Amino acid sequence: MTQMEIAQKGTSSEEMKRVAEYEEMNLEVIRQKLAYGKAVLPKNKLHKIEKPMIVGEGFTVKVNANIGTSQAFFSLEEEKEKARVAIEYGADSLMVLSTWGDLKEIRKAIIDLSAVPVGSVPIYDSAMKSYQLKKNVVDFSEKDFLNMVISHAEDGIDFMTIHAGITKKVLEHVKNSGRILKVVSRGGAIIAGWMIKNNKENPFYEYFDELLDIAKDYDITLSLGDGMRPGTVLDASDVQQFEELFVMRELVEKAREKGVQVMLEGPGHIPLNEVELNVKLMKKIGEDAPIFLLGPLPTDRAMGYDHIACAIGGALAGYYGADFLCYVTPSEHISLPTIEDVREGVIASKIAAAIADLARGNRKAWWLEKQMALSRKNFNWEEMFKLSLGKDLARKKYKERPYLHEGCSMCGPFCAIKIVEEFF
């Protein structure tokens, strides 16, 4: 049985008990959210996860970190270190998005070392093999679509991005639209190219029932990819974006009927004033399925600092109901991220998630804020560093410009806390 089916029967899995403890929430609430599809607990039956996560309505906002090779840089050891760093700094899940090298070896290595759920995009494997053999990323057969899904499932992948919402009708409309950047989703572009080249329907959409059978066998959580997500704020919230979302609604209903866990992926580049609209429409149209957002980025002009733009958009999106934030690194739109980029990206998105949790009234989030406030009041620097989401940088800054007395080198004897302590 899948986690959803277990919950529907009124029983609890070991993973449910563990996330209930982490979330400090009643187990019955966990079961209800999973049973109705308002939450997902990604956990392949073949993957032992030390730190399972629950994503959805009423739970803490989660953060995903993307790692993976490219044609220019494909070091397995570097990707393994990225995975370790991402987990160390609080990533709740990883996605292995490699497009070069021995993809199966890389994927299995990350799954083996990961204490958190691991996701993937199976279509990348088909595209890479096609490019290596024929120098064309879309020259593969319909069978390759499902075969790659099976391969990833057998390796232990917990959740998969499947771009099943791009139908021939959706694709025709985007081709004739006024969009500046027609398709910026890599997986979405590969599938769109395949559909145009072969003049056929999207196999992920056409064979979605078969896909559900595979997902159910392994308890894979399907993450319905938004192939039509906007790649610039100028294309945000357009007809094409929401047309695909209505197709995804249909697929959510099918998945739930089958007992398969499912969530929706979302944009993308969205101006700040449209974040609330996008999140609430995704929840409404998607029948309260969990929402997994890339960013969102409220400006296109933050190159080199996109992780900061991402944190701004992510905090607001989380407040309005987004459940799962995919981090963005300083290398976004520029290059393959380094290990340091991964660290910075995770910290930025964890800050966004913490801000959202606080604004949503999460008790655990408020308790942590109280501990930080008390630590500051008592000049307990070690405790402050432990509570900080950027603990290493905080400690480094403190040591670089020390103050020999209580307080810090910013205020010295003019410290407001010390003055109040003495005279109040």
Curated annotation (Swiss-Prot):
Protein name: Phosphomethylpyrimidine synthase
GO biological process terms held by the UniProt record: thiamine biosynthetic process; thiamine diphosphate biosynthetic process
Residue positions binding [4Fe-4S] cluster: C408, C411, C415
Cofactor: [4Fe-4S] cluster
Protein residues bound to Zn(2+): H269, H333
Function: Catalyzes the synthesis of the hydroxymethylpyrimidine phosphate (HMP-P) moiety of thiamine from aminoimidazole ribotide (AIR) in a radical S-adenosyl-L-methionine (SAM)-dependent reaction.
Record gene name: thiC
GO cellular component, one term: cytosol
Lineage: Bacteria, Thermotogati, Thermotogota, Thermotogae, Thermotogales
Matches recorded under Pfam families: ThiC_Rad_SAM
Key word Ribosomal protein present: no
Record family assignment: Belongs to the ThiC family.
Catalytic activity, as annotated: 5-amino-1-(5-phospho-beta-D-ribosyl)imidazole + S-adenosyl-L-methionine = 4-amino-2-methyl-5-(phosphooxymethyl)pyrimidine + CO + 5'-deoxyadenosine + formate + L-methionine + 3 H(+)
Domain of life: Bacteria
Enzyme class, spelled out: lyase
EC number, as in UniProt: 4.1.99.17
Record's cofactor remark: Binds 1 [4Fe-4S] cluster per subunit. The cluster is coordinated with 3 cysteines and an exchangeable S-adenosyl-L-methionine.
Molecular function as annotated in GO: 4 iron, 4 sulfur cluster binding; carbon-carbon lyase activity; zinc ion binding
InterPro entries: ThiC, ThiC/Bza_core_dom, ThiC/BzaA/B
Disulfide bonds: none
Keyword terms of this UniProt record: 4Fe-4S, Iron, Iron-sulfur, Lyase, Metal-binding, S-adenosyl-L-methionine, Thiamine biosynthesis, Zinc
Keyword Iron: yes
Binding residues for substrate: N66, M95, Y124, H163, S185, R186, G187, D226, G227, M228, R229, E265, F292
Species per Swiss-Prot/TrEMBL record: Pseudothermotoga lettingae (strain ATCC BAA-301 / DSM 14385 / NBRC 107922 / TMO) (Thermotoga lettingae)
Positions in coiled-coil regions: none
Pathway, per record: Cofactor biosynthesis; thiamine diphosphate biosynthesis
